[in-house]
From Swiss-Prot:
It catalyses: (1S,2R)-1-C-(indol-3-yl)glycerol 3-phosphate + L-serine = D-glyceraldehyde 3-phosphate + L-tryptophan + H2O. PROSITE patterns: TRP_SYNTHASE_BETA. It comes from Klebsiella pneumoniae (strain 342). It holds the Pfam family PALP. This is Tryptophan synthase beta chain. GO terms for molecular function: tryptophan synthase activity.
Amino acid sequence: MSTLLNPYFGEFGGMYVPQILMPALRQLEEAFVSAQKDPAFQAEFTDLLKNYAGRPTALTKCRNLTEGTRTTLYLKREDLLHGGAHKTNQVLGQALLAKRMGKTEIIAETGAGQHGVASALASALLGLKCRIYMGAKDVERQSPNVFRMRLMGAEVIPVHSGSATLKDACNEALRDWSGSYEKAHYMLGTAAGPHPFPTIVREFQRMIGEETKAQILEKEGRLPDAVIACVGGGSNAIGMFADFIDETNVGLIGVEPAGHGIESGEHGAPLKHGRVGIYFGMKSPMMQTADGQIEESYSISAGLDFPSVGPQHAFLNSTGRADYVSITDDEALDAFKALSRHEGIIPALESSHALAHALKMMRENPEKEQLLVVNLSGRGDKDIFTVHDILKARGEI
């Protein structure tokens, strides 16, 4: 099928979906391309971001974490956004697109529940009926977010098949959409999946990097040495990276979850430790067995527990423009505790992975003068029970 925009990033991406979904993807691409050129759409989107979601978000300098080093560390505060994470940015854009296409229903999948909450709030705001697929395991470990979604009128559907996590929720959501796309829009939650989703999600998240660039220039008079973001599917990271890709002096660092350690096999780091395959409508690196079955991913953080990754990250990795590293559960937990204790900010476990890598860079070379920005993609309210139980079991509280 011919497309208006390039569906590939190098060899990665594409539209590997059943023929029945092609018209829906084509309609979505057409709506997106026309909306990008429509001043009225852009004005409404900008107004919602400012007056409903609370943009621009702050860029906060860490006062205490960097003590004894020559690192200057800033946090891009997506945790302050209405809804509690960066997810709100792009769902407002997609919900406006759904209305533009005349859709009345929203289908979404969610892992940590943050995208579910964002989808529910955007649907409530814009008068759309919303149903959200969520792995049964995630329903258990993210109960506050499940209640928030239901409170805002969304139907939450637990998925018991497979590993009962995000990848299974994705499969169910796609299955639903293939039978209901005439009236429903599939609100994909990350910069992955079939074209045009990776491009749409990037464009509806790119204000993260645009704001960061303007804010750091104002505060420091120069661009950062590196911007750092966690990578599951990759939407918060691509939102941060997009405006810096052409700034070749700025390092782009994506942080995948190493879970219990890469060597344990229990991780979610397909970029560095997976193989290219086709899953979830796209060609990208993924965790798979020797005979091509999708393997279970694992992370303490539900939002990073995904066996593949967005195609633009795969491309940035293949060209060397971005570096991808991994952080274990324990390292992320330590960063979670450190930021809470020393800066009075409780981060999401997802964002704690990015912070942990920044702290590692700082501690490995305390004499190095460096300016780092971490995308604090979400707040940690949803994770306090998980962390409490772990710390209690360890006798730390």
